[in-house]
Amino acid sequence: MDMSPTPEFPASLEWLNLSKPLRMGQLRGRVTALVFFNVGSAWCQQRLSDLATLRKRYGEHLHVVAIHVPRFDHERDPKRVLKRLQRVPLDFPIAHDADWVLWQHYVIDAWPTVVL
């Protein structure tokens, strides 16, 4: 595993529910869970729901950033992803990593994966 400092979020990420891109520097010193998920997976939907519950329980002591990584071509459309996600109320930033940049940096090999 690469133990280098946490990289800045790549410019290629599309933030689905933020007006301005999130910067990794905004999270420094905070307990943060990066969850790599796929919108088409029921297992991933459950993990997102679990993390939303933990956010409610721990408030500002736990930050969550969800990173959607498409598995199929139709999941590359961020509008479709956002539409699917509106079924579950989530109060944390959601990014669309269409090019798998963060997935590759963290050497992720399965959905869902949570990195603290």
Task: Give residue ranges: language-model regions.
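Active-site acidic short loop of glycosyltransferases
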Residues: 28-30, 60, 90-91, 108-111
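N-terminal "domain-start" segment that seeds a small globular fold
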Residues: 1-25
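Structural microenvironment flanking redox-active thiols in thiol-disulfide oxidoreductases
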Residues: 45-88, 98-104
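Hydrophobic/aromatic beta-strand patches that form the interior of the parallel beta-sheet core
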Residues: 34, 65-67, 95, 115
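A short, hydrophobic beta-strand/beta-hairpin element that forms part of a small beta-sheet core
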Residues: 9, 94, 101, 110-116
